[in-house]
């Protein structure tokens, strides 16, 4: 299947009035996780633009440090993904504790970059866009169009770059399994 880039959502859709934002239910982690994953899929191009703007600003201010910091984070992330696919314990940790997995990647990157003296570039250049994405994805309530687009991605009618990343982090398999177990129930 061909990978499709998700369309850039309008500013009114991406950042509407305060009535389309709501505090997540911290007691129901799976519901909160579902909101974050679905918003990451739906607004992925907008998030890419925000990240590119922040990275460009920081990169302009400190290009060498930004390059070193970005390289280290990518290498650490690829290393963890490779190790987790080859080691059962890490794979289970990634599946059961995805937030912990990402925090371990960030902390590992922090320590590697601190040896190079580029901690501030890492913190502002790479972590700030991730934090902004997470905050928006956590607070933004979904709409009908969002839910429809996410269903297309879940059942495999389309594939997007964020969908590939979430698959690598094993965040979409549960949704597909839920859908697969729901279809026979509907037929009955």
From Swiss-Prot:
It comes from the Eukaryota. Residues 1-35, 78-93, 136-188 are cytoplasmic. It is found in: Endoplasmic reticulum membrane; Cell membrane; Cytoplasm; Cytoplasm, Cytoskeleton. One of its GO terms (cellular component) is membrane. Residues 136-188 are annotated as: Targeting to endoplasmic reticulum membrane. It holds the Pfam family PRA1. Keywords: Acetylation, Cell membrane, Cytoplasm, Cytoskeleton, Endoplasmic reticulum, Membrane, Transmembrane, Transmembrane helix. It is a multi-pass membrane protein. The chain crosses the membrane at residues 36-56, 57-77, 94-114, 115-135. The modification N-acetylmethionine is found at residue 1. GO terms for biological process: cellular response to oxidative stress; glutathione metabolic process; intrinsic apoptotic signaling pathway in response to oxidative stress; L-glutamate import across plasma membrane; L-glutamate transmembrane transport; learning or memory; negative regulation of L-glutamate import across plasma membrane; negative regulation of mitochondrial membrane potential. Binds to prenylated RAB and Ras superfamily members. Regulates intracellular concentrations of taurine and glutamate. Negatively modulates SLC1A1/EAAC1 glutamate transport activity by decreasing its affinity for glutamate in a PKC activity-dependent manner. May be involved in membrane traffic. Belongs to the PRA1 family. This is PRA1 family protein 3. It comes from Gallus gallus (Chicken).
């Amino acid at each position: 299947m061909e990978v499709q880039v998700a369309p850039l959502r309008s500013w009114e859709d991406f950042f509407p009035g305060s009535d389309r934002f709501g505090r997540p239910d911290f007691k129901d982690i799976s519901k909160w996780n579902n909101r974050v994953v679905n918003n990451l899929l739906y607004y992925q191009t907008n998030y890419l633009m925000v990240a590119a703007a922040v990275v460009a600003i920081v990169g302009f201010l400190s290009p060498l440090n930004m390059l070193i910091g970005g390289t280290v984070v990518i290498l650490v992330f690829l290393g963890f993904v490779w190790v987790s696919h080859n080691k059962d314990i890490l794979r289970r940790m990634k599946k059961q504790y995805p937030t912990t997995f990402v925090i371990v990647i960030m902390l590992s990157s922090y320590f590697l970059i601190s040896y190079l003296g580029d901690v501030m570039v890492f913190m502002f250049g790479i972590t700030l866009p991730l934090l902004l994405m997470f905050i928006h994805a956590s607070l933004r309530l979904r709409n009908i169009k969002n839910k429809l687009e996410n269903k297309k991605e879940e059942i495999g009618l389309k594939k997007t770059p964020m969908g590939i990343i979430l698959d690598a982090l094993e965040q979409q398999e549960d949704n597909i399994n839920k859908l697969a177990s729901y279809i026979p129930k509907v037929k009955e």
